[in-house]
């Protein structure tokens, strides 16, 4: 069936529609509103986004914070040029970290960030991942100090389709105004559309709940299996505070800010008796595993053959999604992380 065929999720996007910079002020970004019941499409801007939110809906937001996950160092302490890139993915046990390292590397290699700080390769894992430990003055760093190291020496992990180096503006624009808990290596991009003023109005006028899904580097990996149902999606760290859990359990109508919030809600609501706050989220939503517990979604326009495009198709239908995306292309909407948005009602 074509809805499970990977090629059905391909489309052509003119390169000039890939957003390399955000629209400022945020309210000027374009917004496509699609009402599923009437199939009506409205073209507006984020200045009016809250006008379309259903008054009784619970709005769910992901408050993860992007860390400066890209580090550059040298394999020799005395070399001033830093050409070896270390991409921090997530913490592992005993204060070690899962990373990707560009170029040839072997167990025991050290990568120096300055005269005091370096990383040592402990193990070569599958999928190109490397297990490393960080050191300061030859002493192993704990997670708190690793985060300080990343903040001091790291670069914002812009997506691979943004063909430029990170700049000073990315430190705050590739971060939602409600970002709180450090751990993501990619931004939950629908959240980037909210200015402080819009957020304050949302929190004042709507029921809301926060959760934390630390977006992993796997979010940029395309689906590669010919039958999308065979795809194994990446696992991400999820935390839902008890207060938010209670609100979610009572809510009948849910609007999620972004696919990460939606996946988190769907994962949580399918658990029989959740009795903890921390989870490992690995839910893959598509037409054979449809959305059951979320009614509305604010999202960006996603990459061809991506699991996120399949999620949108699970909500809207494959043909309607392709039709809407074609309209967005014709109307010159800007795509991907720094692009415009789409509200599905």
Predicted regions and their residues:
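Surface-exposed, charge/polar-rich loops and edge strands
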Residues: 1-345
